[in-house]
Amino acid sequence: MESSSSGTTSSTIQTSSGSEESLMEQRKRKRMLSNRESARRSRMKKQKLLDDLTAQVNHLKKENTEIVTSVSITTQHYLTVEAENSVLRAQLDELNHRLQSLNDIIEFLDSSNNNNNNNMGMCSNPLVGLECDDFFVNQMNMSYIMNQPLMASSDALMY
C-alpha cells in the first residue's frame, strides 16, 4: 500500500505541477498579448503624433509663405511711397526756392517803389542813371513779371 500512496503523491505533484505550468504558460501568453497590444497602441500613438506634427509643419510652412509674401508686398509699397516722398521733397524744395525768389523780387520792387517816391522820379540805382519808368512799379504790369518762370543760365551756377 505504501507503494500506491507514494505513486499517488507523485502523480498529484505532477498534476499540480502541470497545472502550474499551464497556468504559467497562460500568464506568459496573456502578458505577451498585453505587451503586443501595448506596443501596437504605442506605435499608433507615435504615428498619430508624427502625423499631427507633420500637419503642423505644413501649416507653419504655409503661414510662413504668406508672411513672406506679405512682407514682400509691404516692402514694395514702402519703396513706392519712399520714391514718391523723394519726388515730393524735391518739388517742395523747388517751390520754396521759387517762393523765396519771388519774395526777393517783390521786396526789390517795393524798395524801388519807396525809393522812387523819395527820389522824385529818379531811379534808386545810381549805376543806371536813368529815370524810373512807371512800368516797373505799375500794378497792372506786375502780373506779367510774376507769371514768368525763373530760369538760371548754366553760367550763373558756376562759381
Curated annotation (Swiss-Prot):
Cellular localization per UniProt: Nucleus
CC annotations in GO: nucleus
UniProt region (Disordered), positions on chain: 1-47
GO-annotated molecular function: DNA-binding transcription factor activity; protein heterodimerization activity; sequence-specific DNA binding; transcription cis-regulatory region binding
GO biological process: negative regulation of translation; positive regulation of DNA-templated transcription; response to sucrose; sucrose induced translational repression
Chief location category: nucleus
Tissue: Highly expressed in stems and flowers. Expressed in root tips, cotyledons, leaf vasculature, embryos, apical parts of siliques and funiculi.
Inducers of expression: By light. Induced by hypoosmolarity. Repressed by sucrose (at protein level).
Highest taxon, organism lineage: Eukaryota
UniProt keyword terms in alphabetical order: DNA-binding, Nucleus, Stress response, Transcription, Transcription regulation
PROSITE patterns: BZIP, BZIP_BASIC
Segments for region (Leucine-zipper): 53-67
Extent of Low complexity compositional bias: 1-21
Pfam families (UniProt xref): bZIP_1 (PF00170)
Domain (bZIP): residue spans on this chain: 25-88
InterPro entries (UniProt xref): bZIP, bZIP_plant_GBF1, bZIP_sf
Record note on quaternary structure: Forms heterodimers with BZIP1, BZIP9, BZIP10, BZIP25 and BZIP63. Interacts with ADA2B.
Family annotation (PANTHER family): BZIP TRANSCRIPTION FACTOR 11, BZIP TRANSCRIPTION FACTOR 44
Function: Transcription factor that binds to the DNA sequence 5'-ACTCAT-3' in target gene promoters. Promotes POX1/PRODH1 expression in response to hypoosmolarity stress. Positively regulates the expression of ASN1 and POX2/PRODH2 genes, which are involved in amino acid metabolism. Regulates several metabolic pathways such as myo-inositol, raffinose and trehalose. Regulates several trehalose metabolism genes, including TRE1, TPP5 and TPP6. Mediates recruitment of the histone acetylation machinery to activate auxin-induced transcription.
Further information: A highly conserved upstream open reading frame (uORF) coding for 42 amino acids is essential for the BZIP11 sucrose-induced repression of translation (SIRT). Plants over-expressing BZIP11 show severe alterations of plant growth and development, reduced seed set and viability.
Name by which UniProt lists this protein: bZIP transcription factor 11
Gene: BZIP11
